[in-house]
């Protein structure tokens, strides 16, 4: 569990991060249900938001005028990634970080990140991350319900729930953030959860990943950046999981 003193430090980091974006431009790629709260958060904190989506204005329906009322500028249609210019670009979890539009934005000086990566940096409470080829959602939901049954305050996010960055300011050090993480979200993550759970590994999403090695390398990011005392839990009945999980001085649990 995180200490209250450390929690105050993280809360200041959240406020400082949002303050650092005030007056700057942030492009949010994807105007789905999950990204709308992120757009709202940024707009409320004085960020000039460019909300980008492949959908047309008609397809977005009421969401388009609602976002414009908040101050967001919309960049819609098939060319929504063309000439992407912003101080910060929040990529959607399902988008590879090496697509040409993002590489070009980086070359122009943009910081390309994701809502989840920023959340990991500023979260004041214990993060439990769950990944795997199958069973992620079920396992994530079970962990969250077990903690709630124990009287804990739990924030559910990642592939399920909503953007947790929006909740970070109200989180307490004794709370838990339980996060489902896909291989796409983990692909370029440089931080790992305090408790990492890998349900299993099997060939999956190879239409998007270059090969099985890249897919597994993405999954391994759930624990590769952990610190001493953090915990990683693996499924010992899954041969691929055991084969590819590298040894480490950090705590390891097989179940």
Can you describe what each PLM-predicted range is?
Residues 2, 35, 123:
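Short, conserved glycine- and acidic-residue-centered signature motifs
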Residues 2, 27, 197:
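Conserved Rossmann-like nucleotide-binding pocket used by diverse enzymes
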Residues 24-25, 66-70, 152-153, 243-246, ...:
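Secondary-structure boundary/capping motif
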